[in-house]
């Protein structure tokens, strides 16, 4: 959990926002997936948001659903994902690592065991996409018991009560959703969300990172101008993977360019 705090402190000293890429672990194969993560970090990613392949990812649009299918086709299991996470953490001791999960995967071996495993491999945060704040008690208590930050989604239509709950229960960062619906770069992020950011700050919520539909540097700048601490981009990155499945080296070089440009936009 402290890694997020250290990151945000470091960035605010430099007057920079955070750029956080999302990819699905094991897409398109475990070996290439680790190379992709190396590339994202080398290009300037401030933290990682990683998905564990799941058969029915409700919050995700077609791009990330396809990433899940590719990882499944490569035979990737949750156990293998934890091995990959341990490898990433060993290589990068300081970068914050967040997981984006669905409740079934957390439940499968027991909630407490899941968070314990996360702690063992060096995961910093877990967002359970299909568990609303009101039903989150068993997840967030197990998370905190093992030193893992529970992350909550703040939707664009959040009312005051929900904002207070998110501020009270969330740690690490707050996932500010740019618009209703599923993930995807096809639909642009809806801005501005200044009023939400102002309220989250007033209630001392964890720093907001904005995601869903963030696919170009201009949007990163708009996100930071609205007061968010940074931007998360997933579908735009996964599309680069999808487009270059037969050219793994081109894939890595295009990813490097994209992340470098997105990161550059966080520097005022």
Curated annotation (Swiss-Prot):
One Pfam family matching this protein: Trp_syntA
Subunit record text: Tetramer of two alpha and two beta chains.
Pathway(s) the chain acts in: Amino-acid biosynthesis; L-tryptophan biosynthesis; L-tryptophan from chorismate: step 5/5
Provenance organism: Pectobacterium carotovorum subsp. carotovorum (strain PC1)
PROSITE patterns in alphabetical order: TRP_SYNTHASE_ALPHA
GO function terms (MF aspect): tryptophan synthase activity
EC category: lyase
Role, per record: The alpha subunit is responsible for the aldol cleavage of indoleglycerol phosphate to indole and glyceraldehyde 3-phosphate.
EC number(s) on file: 4.2.1.20
Protein name (record): Tryptophan synthase alpha chain
Catalytic activity: (1S,2R)-1-C-(indol-3-yl)glycerol 3-phosphate + L-serine = D-glyceraldehyde 3-phosphate + L-tryptophan + H2O
InterPro entries associated with the record: Aldolase_TIM, RibuloseP-bd_barrel, Trp_synthase_alpha_AS, Trp_synthase_suA
